[in-house]
């Protein structure tokens, strides 16, 4: 292997070095600033068939279906921690089984948590008076949309797992606005 003489090595002048340094700095800052903007516009990937979030009770414990159903009556709607940490109602059906859907408790008007009013059998928002029927369909505004749904599946180890609802909304017959 032969040695390269000093005259054959290209000389990086001061001006070229400063241009390279300036270009590198501007590129780094621009990439750092654009990253969150680009990430915002790229939708999150789907959870897949096995994906989901285990429902948690008010104390942060996993919801065990057999224990849950013994302590709740038919028609009950009970809050659990659901997808993205949102409060989500578990629904006990008339035959004392758990419904295969959960109802997100966040009001579609301004984001208040909507409590279940058992005596009137509907969800009533305390902030601005929006009302939803027992399935979470809006019946009185100012809320523009029904409450979001999530699948509530029972696993082999008797726990509830919430997953994203992407099918047609059975209450309205329309595509889900939340997916």
Curated annotation (Swiss-Prot):
The reaction(s) this protein catalyses: 2 oxidized [plastocyanin] + a plastoquinol + 2 H(+)(in) = 2 reduced [plastocyanin] + a plastoquinone + 4 H(+)(out)
InterPro entries the record matches: Cyt_b6_f_Rieske, Rieske_2Fe-2S, Rieske_2Fe-2S_sf, Rieske_Fe-S_prot, Rieske_Fe-S_prot_C
Transmembrane portions of the chain: 20-42
One Pfam family per UniProt: TM_PetC
Entry keyword set: 2Fe-2S, Disulfide bond, Electron transport, Iron, Iron-sulfur, Membrane, Metal-binding, Thylakoid, Translocase, Transmembrane, Transmembrane helix, Transport
GO cellular component: plasma membrane-derived thylakoid membrane
UniProt function note: Component of the cytochrome b6-f complex, which mediates electron transfer between photosystem II (PSII) and photosystem I (PSI), cyclic electron flow around PSI, and state transitions.
Name of the protein this chain belongs to: Cytochrome b6-f complex iron-sulfur subunit
Gene label: petC
